[in-house]
Amino acid sequence: MLKTKRGSLFSQLVLFFCACFYAEISGADPKQAIVGVATNFITTIETLQRDFETRHEGKLIVVGGSTGKLYAQINQGAPIDIFLSADQARPAQLEDDGLAIAGSQFTYAIGRLIAWLPGRSTGPGHFSLSQEETVALLKNSSRIALANADLAPYGLASKQLLQSLGLYEELGPRIVRGENIGQTFSLISSGNAEAGFIALTQALAHPEAVSNDRYWMVDETMHTPIRQDAILLKRAAENPIALAFMQYLRSPAARQIIREAGYAI
């Protein structure tokens, strides 16, 4: 009973602090837009934000988190103007829920999944592992990090990959889960997991952390494509900065930044 009460109190505190944070940024300022961004895209959105703000007088406020949590927060009334999801399903669901503008959804990036095996390199050459080598190394790893498949599309892709390889049940007891792909990266980089699955863009964004490690560029046919969609929320229907950023995301300048970060588009 005590455990239940403590869990309930913790949940209430989390909701309280989230509410306080959103209350501070929720003012209807026509010169700013609040963008909810999936964790894998945080580093890239920072580059896009700088470029966008040099071209427009308005300001972007970035709120990061797992796709599942951001979706839940929007449903609970969080004042987010644009949702940059790591999947297609949740933006579509927001439209079905009547919270997003019909026809505003589009794919802004297609993610790539890689297997990361720290300290396993015998020389230079990232992404040099074969599928067979990766499977053998995974089987010899005591802890393998994946993002939560229920909250993070990269976690779902990782689970699907292991199922395709026939390894999910075998490795199940050794799997540790991060809430999002950022926490998964931290589990591996800190040594709390010997191997795991991250986004290609994370490896490119943190060369100092992964410079001597080995990778397998996952075969994209072994999991559902990680198509990442954006959608405009109804609260921002007349927000000029939100409208401008949605248009900017489709521009050649933005797409070049997104490609350089390790995404397809």
Could you tell me what each predicted segment is?
Residues 1-6:
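N-terminal secretory signal peptides that target proteins for export/translocation
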Residues 8-10, 92:
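Composition-driven detection of intrinsically disordered, low-complexity segments
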Residues 11-22:
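Bacterial N-terminal signal peptides
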